[in-house]
């Protein structure tokens, strides 16, 4: 792949045009690696990943035949995504939760940790050992592995390659699209910008996750008519324009540079369009009930009869961290989840809801361990809202992560040691070290003569934005390459045990819900042979591609 786009991006950076949040996810792959690192040509095809997932489902069907016959199918599917929610994050978050309750902490459990089934998913991208949130979103929402930095396309599309992404045979559909095709309703909820990688995986087809508004696309020299930005795709194109609930941040991606939002954040669009108004006009023309929301008070005033369509953009960029947010304007993830379920539950056929605790990831990137753990606890509260609201015998709730981080939970401290404090011993140089530390990130301190500084003497030691001990200095802490947990509750939860590719997750959800083009629990495994089913499945994928982009 050519390096022309690197020159464009470098020039944009010099001019101060690159979005500030790029520091969380710097592009670390060298030019050309987006395609050259592909392990095999087959992995660039959607059929490779679809076949692998469907064959695994067939094996699981045989293993769980009795449970399959007894449970029926899931009418409602809710997927919770803890962005960057690694196993050490879970262990530390549950310990913090217990210590907040006056316990020693280790014995506590998050609500979703009590789900009956636990599995593990492998998170690598086709071209990367350690993934980002866009190739993983394509995996756990579309069932196909992709290149780092791309969304809703196969690995045949290198990052930044606008032209390749316009090929309909290289686009893939998400479980949200499968739900819509089955007559169910769809909602997406996140604490990040709604155009960010994870939520965008439900609807966007882009060669670069950073193309959140039209100016992002233009900066790389591309035609927005050929490669529409993510905000445009959400508001003006299927499937996004059919979503009943859209809750998150990112007003700036929808507003022109000539306009500021309700809290003074200036828009980033250079096409002069106000996509929030366009969304309202579209709903008005359809003669459906709708409402645009920008703060918590408006959300809470909806009451028991919210309108059919809701667009809630609660910040100019990402929502504030829970511990730092303004309660008058900032809704909690639990509140957003509650409203979303109430709206979507009115569809008798059921719904698919995607909920992301997205700022776990951002806190880890900044080495803010306390904030990362609190964001995890906040997502857990949202999960409890969902399981309290839904019937276990007609719903499936899956809680997972897209990737991990490099925070470790270490030392040999006694039971009940403050999880946010120091280990009850010193290092070989008689210096204290933290229970939670990071392999890399911006929290690294300069060592004098090979001796670590005493971090407990920092002026802001223990503050929310105090950076815990870090080894390797980087502007942004990196993701990890280890497996992520998959917790399942409800109808056919047993399908999610074991170790499998992350691409299995949407196929298994669709199987349990009897929707989408793959194998379904509603169809006997003996009725449709795998080879015949795969032919039908691929034909359905192609049909959906064309329907989605007409």
From Swiss-Prot:
It is an enzyme of class 3 (hydrolase). Its cofactor is Mg(2+); Zn(2+). Residues 525-550 form a propeptide. It comes from the Eukaryota. It is found in: Cell membrane. It catalyses: a phosphate monoester + H2O = an alcohol + phosphate. It is a lipid-anchor; GPI-anchor. Pfam families: Alk_phosphatase. The keyword rRNA processing does not apply. SUPFAM superfamilies: Alkaline phosphatase-like. Its main location: membrane. The active site is at 133 (phosphoserine intermediate). Zn(2+) 2 binds at residues 83, 402-403. Keywords: Cell membrane, Glycoprotein, GPI-anchor, Hydrolase, Lipoprotein, Magnesium, Membrane, Metal-binding, Phosphoprotein, Signal, Zinc. This is Membrane-bound alkaline phosphatase. The gene is Alp-m.
